[in-house]
Amino acid sequence: VYKRQLVGLSWFDAGVRSFYTREKVETLADLAGLTLRVQESDMMSEMILDLGAKPAQVVYSRVYAALHNAEIDGAENNWPSYEAMGHYEVAPYFLKDEHARVPELQLASEAAMEKLAELDERFPDIIRACGKESALAERRLWAEREASAEKHMREWGVEVTTLSAAEKARFRAAVEPVYAAFEEQSRLIQRIREA
C-alpha cells in the first residue's frame, strides 16, 4: 500500500448509471436471464448476477454492434453516453434505476505538490483552490448535460421507466450480497452510505 503519495484535489461527476435494453424492463423480475454489458469490474459483474441477469464484458466501442446483433440484451451507462454513442437507436428502453454514481477523482502527486511549494509556498493552495473551483463548474455543467441528454432522448422516443420506491428497494435488497463479497472495502462502503 502506498501511503501519502497522492493528494486528493476534488471529484468530478461522471453521472448516474442506469440500464437500457432492447426490450422493455420495468421490474427486477424483468431482468432475469438478460445478458447485460457492464464495465470490466468484478463488483459490477457480481451486481448483475445478483439482479438475476448475466454480465457480459463487451468492449465499449462494440456495445452498439452487440446490441444491434442481439449479442446482448442491454447495457448500462449515463444519459450523455447513451445519447452520444447512439445506443438509443438499438436499445430504446431506459430503466432509470440509478444503480451507480461513479466519481472521477482529481489527484496530484504529493512529490509534485512539495516541489511546487519549494517554488512558492502559495502554489499548493492555488492548485487545491483550482481543483475545488473546477469541480464545482464541472458538476454544474454535467448536470446541465445530463438533463439535456435525457430531454433529447425522451423527445426522440426513448421509453423511460422510473422505478417506484418499492421496486428500488427490491433492487437494493437484491444487490446486498455484493457488499459482503467485497467486505475488505466495508468501512468505505459504510462511510459512503452514511454520507
Predicted regions and their residues:
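N-terminal secretory/targeting leader peptides
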Residues: 4-195
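Active-site loops and adjacent core secondary-structure elements that bind or stabilize anionic groups
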Residues: 1
